[in-house]
């Protein structure tokens, strides 16, 4: 697993805190949510944030 940059983790955590119902374990849905909730213009950064959020949601689902 790759190490994520700090800004990816910070923004992902902020999005999860503010909009927990906007995200789930589906990457494509999370990608659309990141696009609508942020002003990130870079496709690569958007995908990294969506991937991080997806991973966090999947981990939370396994614990529950």
UniProtKB/Swiss-Prot annotation:
GO terms for biological process: translation. One of its GO terms (cellular component) is ribonucleoprotein complex. It comes from the Archaea. Keywords: Ribonucleoprotein, Ribosomal protein. GO terms for molecular function: structural constituent of ribosome. It holds the Pfam family Ribosomal_S17e. The keyword Ion transport does not apply. Belongs to the eukaryotic ribosomal protein eS17 family. This is Small ribosomal subunit protein eS17. The gene is rps17e.
